[in-house]
Amino acid sequence: MRYLTAFFLICLVAAFLAAQSPSQTLAPTGTLRAIFLGGNPVQGRVDPKTGEAAGPVPDLVRELARRLGVPYKIISAPDAEVILDALKDHTADIGFLAYDPARAREADFGAAFEVMFNSYLVRSDSPIKKSADVDRTGVKVAAVKGQTQELFVSSHLKKAQVRVFQTMPPQADVERLLGSGDVDVFAINRQRSLDAQAASGSKLRALSDSFLEVEQCFVVEKGARAKLDAIEKFVAELRSSGFIKVSIDRAKLTGVDVASGKKR
């Protein structure tokens, strides 16, 4: 009898979940709450004066909310840890992160919408010409703690010394650190490398090749299968319609492409 009761309850829960609409699944409070890395131009940018978010992720959130027929709230996070915590605490419904196996132990990664390329940033007169030149004895590589690039260089570089920063230093400090030789290389995404190169005049140089290609994905709390299914369908439609490509182009992003949709 006990087993029959348990079975009956499981069936009821399954039926309830199946009956939920996409808006109830993705925005259970009635508002779609989305959290992203506000300091990562590949995801989006936040206007310091107005607080308005623009870029691929804000475009995706607004379109998803429009389709669901609900209001939205876009939350800017300083780092991946804040995003993961928000999903665990249910203070956000969906998040956006670059895929990493360590992060996938804390949250479930859904459909990828972008592929992000990553390029090392060096002093303009540096002897380092390509990514393969970096992992050498005596080379000092800087990266920001917990970011995709730091996770990669800390685990893959064998000879170079990795120096981890808590946050991304401002442009003037990046120029000073590279110019003085305190660090030889910054490991950041290609868009940031190119932005820093442009802002420096002729002081800095982004390497032309990519040391890492990473998918930018929707991310949800562990076990939220219904959310992942709804997101997969949504992203597939936007990928095929050209919506994501238009969003990337509108943001004038370099070193970013539409994800292929291949299963991970």
Language model regions located:
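Bacterial N-terminal signal peptides
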Residues: 6-15
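Extracytoplasmic small-molecule ligand-binding "clamshell" domains
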Residues: 21-98, 103, 167, 241, ...
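Periplasmic-binding protein-like
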Residues: 38, 115-125, 190-191, 197-236, ...
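Hydrophobic residues within well-ordered alpha-helices
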Residues: 64, 86-88, 134, 174-179, ...
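A ligand-binding cleft/hinge motif common to bilobed small-molecule-binding domains
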Residues: 81, 97-106, 152-155, 177-212
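Flexible hinge/capping segments at coil-to-helix
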Residues: 122-141
